[in-house]
Amino acid sequence: CALPIFLLGALIVTLLFRRDSKLNSAARQMQEFIGDASHELKTPLTVIRGYSEMLTSNPNKVSEYSARINSESIRMTNIIDKLLKIAALDETNPLQTREIELSDYLQKYVNDLKILQPNRPVKLQANPLQITTDLEVLDTLISNLISNARIHSPIDAPIHLSLEGRNLIIEDGGPGLKVIPDKPFQRFDQSRSRESGGSGLGMSLIQKSAKQLGVKMEFGKSELGGLKVSITF
């Protein structure tokens, strides 16, 4: 009789340990996220405050300083928008799926890039592929991956999108993002992200949207010189 009681006790201890481990992991991730978000919001707020104070002592610079304040306000709004998107990407929310032609869908991003940065070589190589997906979550995934490629590479560096079977590959001419092989989503070079005008929150959106869609992602070095991201649908 003692053996079953012992086994039951061991099972309870194991379950409690697993629960606590999951809670600790979630708490750690939340703490890191809040720390990163606070840091990102603090930077534009500091700039806004600095230029606001200089306005009182140097009224001749009103136009220049006001433009800088407006620029940082827009940046802060974009950061807040990303934070709201991250909060909205709840894995428990059911996906609103529909069937789309992926090659046609990707073409709009190529067209946008050519308008935004006409000097950048942009190429799409894709065969037709029908997939069933949540379009809003997919938009979050693809737009942030392309935004990372655009922000973290020179304006004349190439960005290539290719669709091979059910694999979508997005790569850029670099230097791209720093890849951490064992934990590709955690702690990308965020200081460099801020220097390039990014918020450092894009990878959180990519991670959450990829997980919600159930797609497999791999990161590596592109032959173009930058980052290569492979997504399997």
Task: List each model region and its residues.
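Conserved C-terminal segment of the DHp
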Residues: G50-N60, E64
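Short alpha-helical segment of the dimerization/phosphotransfer core of two-component systems
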Residues: S71-M76
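Conserved micro-motifs of the catalytic ATP-binding
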Residues: E91-Q96, A126, Q130-T133
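A conserved beta-strand-to-alpha-helix junction within the catalytic ATP-binding
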Residues: Q96-K114, N127
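Short helix-loop "hinge" at the ATP-lid/N-box region of the Bergerat-fold HATPase_c
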Residues: A149-R150
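Short conserved segment of the HATPase_c
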Residues: L177-D189
